[in-house]
Amino acid sequence: VILDDLGNENKRMLKEKFQEEREFDFTAQDFARVRKLIYQHAGISLSDAKTDMVYSRVGRRIRTVGLNSFKDYLDWLESDQNEGEWENFTNALTTNLTSFFREEHHFPILAEHIKKLAKPIRIWCSASSTGEEPYTIAMTACEAFGTLKPPVEIIATDIDTNVLATAARGVYPFDRVSKLSEKRKKEFFQKGSGAQEGLVRVRNELRNLISFQQLNLLDNQWPIKEPFDAIFCRNVMIYFDKPTQSKILKKFVPLMKPHALLFAGHSENFLYVSTDLQLLGKTVYELKHGDGQKRQL
């Protein structure tokens, strides 16, 4: 009985959450519909705790296109003539938390790894966000080889076209690089002046190492054929359910060279959803080998 009461209380609280004073009509059915659509389109699983986030972010789109309710917007979204709005819808619900040298322990491992490889070296950053991660990979490659023109090709992809545009520009507020060493700031960035005061731009040599392109990890076919020496898929899987995680990891396997490393986020464990990988170190994986041997990092 107590458990039933708790369940009813949770339902009551959720109902009240949807009945709060809001600019747009937003029902539990609308929220369920948003969850279903973003899961089908981008594989993102939204919990009940995301109601306010959904209202806020999708509400901005409703305001922009001049509609009056979530139902009207979602009907319009699904109509044949509005394919372009799917991109805006997906961008609105994508979270982009990132920084330069985030989860820093990965980059000395990457540096040692790529110094041993045949050239040229291919690296895939599968969730580029606003560019800090692929530029960090590029900086690591430059430092590993002692040149601004290392033998490295970096493919950086993301589902969100807005953040990809930011990444390709390579322009950031100065506080984004404030925690980098003075040496790195001087070597890899140019400080803005005049109208660009307070901004920094990634040096062209770094940007030339990276090819940015839109890619949905949920797509059946990826526009990528050649295998990689390293793949970064960090803090992405936490937004997907386990079947989706397993599907994506299985598609990584043929894109990994025999010696390739796969880097995960700090709260992600790929061993639960893949039988093709083995753990090398803290959130660093490689393909399983027939002899059962494991490299030392």
What are these regions (language model features)?
Residues 268-297:
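Class I S-adenosyl-L-methionine
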Residues 118, 172, 257:
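Short conserved AdoMet
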Residues 147-232, 236-244, 269-271, 291-294:
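Extended basic-aromatic, gly/pro-enriched interface segments that bind polyanionic ligands
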Residues 259-266:
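Conserved beta-strand signature within the Rossmann-like core of class I S-adenosyl-L-methionine
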Residues 2-124, 265:
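Conserved AdoMet
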